[in-house]
Amino acid sequence: MIFLKRIIQQQESELMNTYNNVNVEKLANIYFEGKVISRTITFSDKTIKTLGVMLPGEYEFKTNSKELMEIISGELSVQLEDETNWNNIKEGMSFNVSKDSSFKVKVLKTTNYSCSYLD
């Protein structure tokens, strides 16, 4: 029984790393001279996400909508607008960004991320 439970948990975990029935834009979003690259995906319910990679460095982003940034792999520090503290974010962690704001990141290790647009 325990073995079967482990298999089910592994399958659930693998499913969470895959998106099905989506449209992917062929043209990549390229920022900071190619050090941050993402692709936009649209789900059947019109939900939009970007999947991307950030190379080590420091970057500042502006937002038009509320965002959920999920770190798939890698490590970075984030400073949200109007905050003085930097927060360390690693694989499996996430953070929220307010609409019409900005945030800074210091990417410590090459980072794969998923950004969900929540508006």
Question: What residue spans do the PLM features occupy?
Answer:
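Ligand-binding loop in jelly-roll beta-barrel domains
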Residues: 98-119
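A generic structural motif
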Residues: 42-44, 79-81, 106, 118
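Short loop/turn motifs at secondary-structure junctions and domain boundaries
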Residues: 32, 59-61, 79
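Short acidic-glycine-tyrosine-enriched beta hairpin
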Residues: 83-99
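Short, conserved beta-strand element in jelly-roll/cupin
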Residues: 64-77
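A short, N-terminal "cap"/entry segment at the start of jelly-roll beta-barrel domains
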Residues: 2-47
